């Protein structure tokens, strides 16, 4: 069976394996029998266990045919809006871009570009609504 970028598929978690110099991975099996590896470290908070079934999006298939999967996030859904608390504001860089830093539900720091046409940066501790554009390695990519 051919996997298609952007589509979700169910995979059974067969076991965890340790690859030298690459760390722990989940060995997954699709119903077609195809086996794939998923790095474990980015998804420590996902409660993925051996013999469980997880739903993953085919994030990318590179030119050599390697498939990159992104498990469905336990909290965030792409293109939905969520509240985040501002933890840090940045100074303008040489291109006059500003950023804010928020934390996701697993306390990952996420930087968000603040448009120059918006009013002033929100204050630290302020709650703001941000859209989850996509998820990469368990961390949301956020947008205003």
Where are the regions that the model predicts?
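Single-stranded RNA-binding regions, centering on S1/OB-family and related RNA-binding modules
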Residues: 1-144
């Amino acid at each position: 069976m051919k996997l298609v970028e952007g589509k979700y598929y169910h995979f059974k978690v067969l076991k965890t394996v340790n690859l030298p110099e690459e760390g722990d991975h989940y060995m997954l099996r699709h119903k077609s029998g195809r086996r794939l590896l998923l790095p474990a470290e980015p998804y420590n908070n996902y409660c993925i266990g051996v013999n469980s079934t997880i739903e993953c999006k085919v994030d990318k298939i590179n030119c050599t045919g390697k498939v990159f999967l992104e498990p469905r996030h336990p909290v965030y859904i792409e293109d939905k809006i969520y509240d985040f608390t501002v933890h840090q504001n940045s100074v303008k860089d040489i291109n006059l871009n500003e950023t804010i830093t928020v934390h996701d539900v697993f306390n990952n720091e996420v930087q968000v570009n603040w448009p120059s046409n918006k009013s002033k940066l929100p204050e630290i501790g302020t709650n703001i609504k941000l859209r989850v554009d996509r998820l990469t390695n368990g961390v949301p990519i956020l947008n205003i």
